A protein has these predicted regions:
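Outer-membrane beta-barrel pore domains
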Residues: 46-47, 94, 109, 118, ...
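Short, electropositive, low-hydrophobicity segments enriched in small/polar residues
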Residues: 38, 112, 185, 214, ...
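Surface-exposed cleft-lining segments at the edges of enzyme active sites
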Residues: 180-184, 230-233
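Residue-level detector of intrinsically disordered/flexible regions characterized by low predicted structural confidence
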Residues: 4-5, 61, 262, 315
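Outer membrane beta-barrel
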Residues: 21-181, 189-196, 200-209, 296-302, ...
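Sec-dependent N-terminal signal peptides
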Residues: 4-13
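Sec/Tat signal peptide C-region and signal peptidase I cleavage site
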Residues: 15-19
Length: 372
C-alpha cells in the first residue's frame, strides 16, 4: 500500500511539473491531418481488360500558424520507389505570409495557380480522377513529358482578394507566381522561370468566372536524341510552353456546376520522365505536334442533403488539338457520405478513344475515401 501511495505522489509531482512548462504558442497551432483513397477499377477495353484494387492516394500533412505566417508540409506515401510518378514523395512544403487579405505571399513547393480544379482536394473534386485536360495541361501526368507532379512546382506566389460588396463578400481574386517549370522536388534546368497566374470574379455568392495564363518552358539536359543519335554531346533543350484556361463554377446548396477549357501551345518530349535516364532523352514527340487542348463540364446534385449526391461529367482531351485524336468520357455515378470523414464514390464511364482501333469501351470505378 505504501508503494502505491508513493508512486501516486511521484506521478502527481511529475504531472504538476509538466503542467508548469509553457510550450511555445506555435506548437499548439500545429495540426496533423491526412487522407486516404482506396480504389477498385475495372476497364473493359477490348484485348486489354483489367480489374484491380488500388491505393489511389495516401497523404499525411502537418500545418500550422505562427504570427502572420501559415505553413504546411505534406508527404504522399503510396506507390513504389522505382519511378518518380508513383514513388513516396514530398508534395507540399511552403510558408505563406497572410497579414493582408489583398496581398498574401507564398514561397516553397505548392499548387500551380492554374485552373479551378487543380488546387482542389481530390476527394472534394468528386470524380474518379481530375479532368483529362487538367491532368495533361496542369502538371499531373503532363503532356510535355514532365514527371508526375500533382499540379505543383517550386516557386513564389502573390495572391489576394478585394473589392468587397455591401455584404462584406469579396468580388475579385487574383494569383500570380514565378516557378522553376520542372515540377516537384526538381531544381531549374534552363534558368527560365514559368509565369503563371489567374484572376476571377465572384458576381454572386457561390459563382466564380475566371481566366488563367501560363508562359514558360520545360527543359532537359541530356545527350540522346533518337532523331540525331550520333550527337552525344550533353546539351540543354528548352521547350517553350504557352497555356491558358477559361473557367466557370457555381457551388451552392449542395449543388456543384463546373466547366473549364484549357489550351496549350508547345512541343513535348517523347519519353515521360519516370527515372533518371529519362531526363537525358531529348527526343521530341512529333506525333502530337505542338498543340493540345481539352474541356470538361460536370454537375453534382444533392439527392439527400449532405449525404447522397448524383453526378455526371462530360470530359474531352485532344493531344494534338484535332478531333480525330480525341478521347471522350461520359461519366455518371453516386457519392455517399457515411460521415463527414468517410465517403464512398462509384461511377460508370463510357469511353470513346479515337486513338484506338476499337474506339468504345466501358469503365467502372469505386472508391472509399477517408480523412483524419
Amino acid at each position: 500500500m505504501r508503494k502505491i501511495i508513493v508512486s501516486a505522489m511521484l506521478c502527481g509531482m511529475i504531472t504538476a511539473g509538466f503542467a508548469q512548462v509553457k510550450l511555445p504558442e506555435w506548437v499548439g497551432n500545429v495540426k496533423l491531418s491526412g487522407y486516404g483513397m482506396t480504389q477498385y477499377q475495372a476497364n473493359f477495353q477490348k484485348d486489354a481488360k483489367t480489374n484491380t484494387f488500388n491505393i489511389r492516394m495516401l497523404r499525411v500533412a502537418l500545418d500550422g500558424k505562427t504570427g502572420d505566417f501559415y505553413w504546411k508540409a505534406q508527404i504522399q506515401f503510396n506507390g513504389n520507389t522505382s519511378t518518380l510518378g508513383s514513388s513516396p514523395r514530398v508534395v507540399d512544403a511552403f510558408a505563406e505570409w497572410q497579414h493582408f487579405d489583398f496581398l498574401r505571399v507564398k514561397a516553397g513547393q505548392f499548387k500551380r495557380p492554374f485552373t479551378f480544379e487543380n488546387p482542389m482536394n481530390p476527394i472534394d473534386q468528386g470524380f474518379m480522377s481530375y479532368g483529362q485536360a487538367v491532368l495533361k495541361l496542369a502538371g499531373f501526368s503532363d503532356r510535355d513529358g514532365d514527371h508526375s507532379s500533382n499540379g505543383r512546382d517550386i516557386g513564389v506566389q502573390l495572391q489576394g482578394d478585394f473589392l468587397k460588396n455591401a455584404a462584406g463578400r469579396n468580388l475579385l481574386h487574383y494569383q500570380v507566381g514565378l516557378f522553376n517549370g520542372q515540377g516537384i522536388n526538381m531544381s531549374d534546368v534552363d534558368n527560365q522561370k514559368d509565369l503563371i497566374g489567374g484572376i476571377w470574379v465572384m458576381p454572386v455568392k457561390g459563382m466564380r468566372l475566371g481566366v488563367f495564363g501560363w508562359t514558360g518552358s520545360f527543359a532537359r539536359k541530356g545527350n540522346y536524341d533518337a532523331a540525331d543519335p550520333t550527337n552525344t554531346a550533353t546539351r540543354t533543350v528548352r521547350l517553350q510552353q504557352r497555356r491558358y484556361a477559361l473557367s466557370a463554377e457555381y457551388k451552392a446548396d449542395g449543388w456543384t456546376l463546373r466547366s473549364e477549357f484549357i489550351h496549350s501551345t508547345g512541343s513535348a518530349f517523347k519519353k515521360t520522365y519516370q527515372k533518371d535516364t529519362d531526363s537525358k532523352d531529348l527526343t521530341i514527340n512529333t506525333g502530337i505536334g505542338n498543340k493540345g487542348d481539352g474541356y470538361y463540364a460536370l454537375a453534382i446534385a444533392p439527392v439527400i442533403q449532405n449525404k447522397l449526391f448524383a453526378k455526371a461529367r462530360y470530359d474531352v482531351y485532344m493531344a494534338d488539338s484535332h478531333w480525330n485524336r480525341a478521347k471522350s468520357m461520359y461519366e455518371a455515378g453516386l457519392n455517399y457520405n457515411f460521415t463527414k470523414n468517410i465517403q464512398l464514390n462509384a461511377e460508370y464511364a463510357l469511353v470513346n478513344d479515337r486513338n484506338l482501333a476499337k474506339h468504345n469501351y466501358s469503365m467502372v470505378d469505386a472508391q472509399l475515401d477517408f480523412r483524419f
